[in-house]
Amino acid sequence: MSSTDWEGHYQTNDTPWDKGEASPGLVDWLAAHPDAPRGTVLVPGCGLGHDVRAWAAAGFTALGLDISPSAVERAKLVGVNERTKFRLGDFLADEPHEQFDWVFEHTCFCAIQPDRRADYVRAVLRWLKPGGHYLAVNYFIPDKDGPPFGVDRDEIWARFSPHFELLEEWTPRSYPNRTGLERMFSWRRR
């Protein structure tokens, strides 16, 4: 996905992006949308799987995909149940074994090299069923020397609006060090 040594980070526990809990924006969205259509969810770049477990606790069947073998193994150790699975894989390069009703973005898009972002959009289209939902917590920072790499609303709109209908956009509750820097988007694939 990028030239970053994600496996090395997980092997040495150098994972400052892991906050030990699901995205506050996701937790709030799940609580506010108890009638959202249940189904399958893919969480690319899932790390230790906190977001995967949040989706599963809300009644979805969730798969966490990560490029780091250590992240996947540790995610499994933290906990799995009949609604959670974790799998080693490259979201950008792998062909999907199935398509999902939902794809959830949280820190994967900003972690990849900016020149791979078109690949990311194509990957979402491969993994997501037509009419499926793409829910994203985007981290808006100006830094171009990532990861995380800078992104803004204009880029998100330019990349996703040709393929998705924007249903909702808002500023979510965030981790303390990201307050005011995250924006959530709820999209439906055309």
At which residue positions do the language-model features occur?
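Class I (Rossmann-like) S-adenosyl-L-methionine-dependent methyltransferase catalytic domain
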Residues: 1-43, 47-98, 112-190
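Conserved acidic residues
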Residues: 101
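A conserved beta-strand element that flanks and buttresses the S-adenosyl-L-methionine
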Residues: 104
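Short catalytic micro-motifs in class I SAM-dependent methyltransferases
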Residues: 107-111
